[in-house]
Amino acid sequence: METLNIFLVIFSLLGTIIIASSSDESSERKKRDLDTIDDTNNDFLTADKRRPGWGKRSFDDDILNNLDKRRPGWGKRSDMLFDSEEIEKRRPGWGKRSSSLYDDEKRKPGWGKRSSALLDDLSLYNSIVKRRPGWGKRSDTFKVDIRRPGWGKRTPGWGKRSGPNMCMDFQDEILQLYKLLNEAEKLHSECEALNI
């Protein structure tokens, strides 16, 4: 019983020592992290520092002002239009969108023009399924089985397949019948040798 009590006392002392040492380390680590954050904030506030990829910012700009800095790759945005009206900025790669398309649904890059002012009123044009980029032109006269871009008329690895050729089919059938005839003659000769 006494050994159990001694063991529990030693175990509890070790636990408190470990907890105290870990809390000291964590408090030192927090202080060190806060110091580095303060140093970086002071560096950015004292000098006109910029992050990598953000490009140069003019000396007139103050870090504390409310000007929206643009992200890398977004290009220049005019401030006159931004002040006069709220314009939704385009993402890189989307290119210019004309003001006539501004209210319409924007198309993704690579999709090209899908509507025309002359054909918008026609219900036939609106009923045509638009093709995705890379699918090529599909004729409107008859329904074409949709295939993946680059496959052509046959799946890759199949080689050229000609149309129905009756001569080749007849030749294959003749060769198969000839092989069956040879097998039958061999079987007949073996049966005669065994007297069956």
Swiss-Prot record:
Residues of the signal peptide: 1-22
Keywords: Amidation, Cleavage on pair of basic residues, Neuropeptide, Repeat, Signal
Tissue localization of expression: Expressed in cerebral, pedal and visceral ganglia. TPGW-amide is found in pedal and cerebral ganglia and in shell adductor muscle (at protein level). RPGW-amide and KPGW-amide are found in pedal retractor muscle, ABRM and shell adductor muscle (at protein level).
Record keyword Ribosomal protein present: no
Disulfide feature: none
Top-rank taxon: Eukaryota
Anything else known: Tetrapeptides may be further processed to GW-amide, which is found in cerebral and pedal ganglia, by a dipeptidyl aminopeptidase.
Protein known as: APGW-amide-related neuropeptide
Source species: Mytilus edulis (Blue mussel)
